[in-house]
Amino acid sequence: LVQAACELGYSGIEAMSMIPGTVGAAPVQNIGAYGQDISKVIEHVEAYDTQTGDLVKITKPEMQMGYRHTRFNYGSDAGRFVILSVTIRLCKGCLQPPFYNSLQRYVENIHETNFSPENIRRMICEIRKEKLPDPAEIASAGSFFKNVYVDQAEADAAEARGIPVWRDADGKGKINSGWLIEACGLKGAELDGFRVSDKAALVLINEKATSYAQLEKARAKIIEAVKNKSGYVLQQEPVEIPTGAKMI
């Protein structure tokens, strides 16, 4: 979908290039990357309600979208709906600088001035290939921790401490959890059979671990290190499926 939209010159989802998964999963977690997220372009979804057996239309306000948080993955409705179709509204045009930090650095390093959706997609793909392991070759769940969202006062305080903050239009901000992990000296570290990626500290790679207990230990060590260093408590992004859970 992202590729097709970019080839047609539509903007709004180009920064979400190479996010694994299907379109139906996009509104469940309110996926996003490099300053864009699906909540900014989604209009409505059509879904199958597993409780009533009905086909329903759910509008954006009804989805209760926040950062990696929606009605579909949190609260009493978590897992209730099977997304059948997604309607989004894109626009003709281009993203304009300043971009999300890592994209901005990439643009400046290569002196790029073409910000068409197709070219932004190309650059995002290059960045992701450089930073993230190929899931077909190396086992990981992608970004293992959510970034930290802060209000305006908290964002001001973070910047005063030298912590980079990506600001929203309303002054609120997002702190890259990978930066916080790297600041603890954990980039490339081996923890209980897992390795913190030496390319992107948000990625936890399974090198030798054979049990969930090892994952628990590695996760706890990272969370504790970041809390002690910066005061922020990281939250896991991948959803855990309990043993024996019924799958639809």
Predicted regions and their residues:
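Recognition helices and adjacent regulatory flanks at domain boundaries
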Residues: E224-A225
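Anion-binding (especially nucleotide phosphate/pyrophosphate-binding) glycine-rich loop
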Residues: L1-T52
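Beta-rich strand-turn-strand
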Residues: E7, Y212-A218
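Proteins with a high burden of low-complexity, intrinsically disordered sequence enriched in S/T/G/P/A and R
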Residues: L1, N228-K229
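Short, solvent-exposed amphipathic alpha-helical segments in soluble enzyme
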Residues: L103, A220-K221
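Generic non-transmembrane alpha-helix signal with a bias for helix starts/N-cap capping motifs
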Residues: K174, R219-A220
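Phosphate/pyrophosphate- and phosphate-bearing ligand-binding catalytic cores of soluble enzymes
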Residues: L55-A213, K229-I248
